[in-house]
Amino acid sequence: MLSVQTCATLDEAARQMGDRTRFLAGGTLVMRGVNYADPSFDRIVRARTMPREIRSDGTGLRIGAGATMADLLAARDAEILHPVARMIGGPAVRNMATVGGNLFAAHPYGDLATALLALDARVEMAGGATEPMETFLAGRDRQRGLVTAVILPRANASEFRWAKISRGK
């Protein structure tokens, strides 16, 4: 039996996470598991609010984990990620899929994670700890808390190139 718990804050939700728990934000990955009766989890935790702000300062770009691909496309400060966000799903998926959730997407769905890795991004967890994207991706299968943001160092959009390569059907 699947149970769902709604928490007031992201920090509270982080404390509720366990081995058989999945966090629900956009739902594009978790709901697939629900629909196909994935036996690896029996509990869903969600928070009433998720950080969605996309903010640039002199040192780089901070993207809240709850920001959707559509939010990225609408943010002038996130221009460097526009080509990537445009390639993720169709409009319905881009309106739901979150930056934080895409970090957990298995091949071939984790397009954003690839670009963030190339841009030397860092992942911020609930509680404030950060780690390099490479370290995060290497251990993402181990439960370690909730992602709250992705932080990119300052980069020039005209110097970054990204291409999606996939098999044709």
Task: Cite the ranges covered by each PLM segment.
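C-terminal structural segment of proteins
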Residues: 1-169
